[in-house]
Regions:
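Active-site-proximal, substrate-binding regions of enzyme catalytic domains
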Residues: 43-82, 86-88
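Phosphate- and divalent-cation-binding pockets in alpha/beta enzyme and binding domains
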Residues: 21, 41, 88, 125-126
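Active-site neighborhoods of divalent-metal-dependent phosphate/nucleic-acid chemistry enzymes
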Residues: 74-115, 119
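Alpha-helix capping/helix-boundary segments
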Residues: 8-9, 38-39, 85, 105, ...
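Short, well-structured N-terminal submotif of metal-dependent ribonuclease cores
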Residues: 1-37, 52-62
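Acidic, PIN/NYN-like endoribonuclease modules and their adjacent C-terminal/linker elements
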Residues: 1, 35, 79, 106-138
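Residues that scaffold the ATP/ADP-binding catalytic core of kinase and kinase-like folds
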Residues: 11-13, 45, 126
Length: 138
């Protein structure tokens, strides 16, 4: 079982450099999971690519959103409610001075005894410090 955070999933979805390394993490046999905040965070990345960076058009943005939702609806990646991990996430956030958004993925990985897949260096460092196996995809 693995937990994919928003940074790694966004890399895959918008095809940032190194996105291919995320593909094996979406194989149903490794039981990929994430917390529901991933949907909001990745939707925001899509918006930024369109609105702020002007790298995609509205039609492309909506297609990326639909691709993400298809992966979730087809249960390629299991999405769990954030509230399930919120207390532990808050503890991690306070202990490491990071956002609760980021710490939710750490709390989920820890609770599930799962490997965390991330493209966030700070997330990687905290995971290692907490004892969570981590795959860093820069």
């Amino acid at each position: 079982m693995i937990v994919i955070d928003s940074s790694a999933f966004s890399k895959f979805l918008v095809r940032e450099e190194g996105w291919e390394k995320v593909v094996p993490c979406l194989d149903p046999s490794v039981e990929p999971r994430a917390v529901d905040i991933l949907i909001v965070e990745v939707s925001n990345v899509i918006w930024k690519y369109m609105e702020k960076y002007k790298l995609i058009k509205e039609e492309q943005a909506l297609k990326l959103y639909e691709q993400m939702m298809r992966l979730i609806k087809e249960e390629i990646m299991v999405i769990e409610p954030s509230v399930k991990y919120l207390r532990d996430a808050l503890k991690i956030a306070m202990g490491y001075s990071i956002t609760v958004y980021d710490s939710l993925f750490l709390a989920q990985a820890k609770a599930l005894n799962a490997k965390l897949v991330t493209s966030d260096r700070r997330q990687k460092e905290i995971a290692e410090d907490i004892g969570i196996p981590v795959e860093y995809i820069p």
